[in-house]
Amino acid sequence: MAEGYVAPGFERVRDAFEAGLEEELGAGFAAVRAGEVLVDIWGGWADRERTRRWARETIAPVYSTTKGVSAIVMAWLADKGMLSYEDAVASLWPAFGAHGKDKLTIAQALAHQAGVPGFINPIDPDLWLDPPACAAAIAALEPMWPPGTASGYHPLTWGYIVGEIAMRAADRSLGAILREEICAPHGIDFQIGTPESEHARAAEVKKPSRVADFGEITPPRRAAFFTPWAAAKRGSSQWRQIEIPSANGHATALGVARLYEVYATGGEISGERLLSPGAFAQLVAPRFRGDDLVLPFNIDWRSGVIGNSNGFYGPNAEAIGHSGAGGSCGFGDPKAGVAAGYVMNKHSHHLMGDPRSLRLIEALYACL
């Protein structure tokens, strides 16, 4: 059974969530509109042994759903004049300009156009746990395609690039900016860099039983996902504590929904303006659309988030969102004025558009 709150008229969402719990280990789903909580429900188990119930305060690693939140932080930095989307990454980080990456803009890096989706040659997997060293290693990479000419999803490296840009622009880490400037003032439960004191409430992940279907394993896909060193020791205590702005956010479903409300409201959280209209327009401006060189989709890339061209985030083309490994997602829909977040700990093999989230989103829109 689901626990939590459902506003009158949104019972269909709870029914869909409870019907889907048979497929879950544990999960949460939340939706907000104009600062009002419409749905905030959870259920199932927070651990693989099924000894710890999923609770209101349970946080789950949301993997690449983190990217849409990091994109908001980058827009905040642009709004404060600390960076410009059209700046070359190398203007803040000269070493990144190696091997012809010198003209790549921050906007292009956010849209996965840098050409460095992973390490094709062997690395020590512990490198991922040392963000400054990992960022330096990424800066030294030769791009796998001419930067700025195509998109190829950077599942992990995106976060080290963005994190280094933020650190150089603001002299603070991206996770600290998120915590101090956005989450703490609004009481939002979303962390990039989760202190050890919070780990007891973190859900354990159950890995998928099958591998995602990427089609042909090309060199960019291999570098991004299919080398023995492509993962960053996910789930370890050290992994939870460091900041990976592409991959290791930990949150409740409500935390995801409240941050993605920025995309539904033109830059506001609970009625308070976070981003100026100009900064928000740059955040959601189309940056590149085409067949991605890593993910097997045609993707409408914005400044770190995804337009709804594939229908993963409800029926409206105006929606903006991002999905994470295993099934999590967050989105905001300015046409409907609604934002939602889905988190879980039983991972599926779906790269985007997990059927579990699609059913919940369909039920949500049926209630609007």
For the regions a protein language model found, what residue spans apply to each?
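Short, gly/Ser/Thr-rich active-site loops of penicillin-recognizing serine hydrolases
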Residues: 244, 265-269, 279, 284-291, ...
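Structured C-terminal helix/loop/strand segments within mature extracytoplasmic catalytic/sensor domains
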Residues: 323-368
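Short, charged, amphipathic alpha-helices and their helix-cap/turn boundaries
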Residues: 41, 124-146, 172-189, 230-232
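Short, conserved catalytic-motif segment at the N-terminal edge
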Residues: 3-62, 82-84
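Flexible glycine/proline-enriched surface loops and loop-helix/loop-strand junctions
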Residues: 55-57, 141-148, 158-161, 236-245
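Active-site-proximal alpha-helical segments within enzyme catalytic domains
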Residues: 112, 158-165, 247-269, 328-345
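Active-site helix/loop module of the DD-peptidase/beta-lactamase fold
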Residues: 56, 61-65, 69, 77-121, ...
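Active-site Gly/Thr loop motif
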Residues: 204-253, 281-336
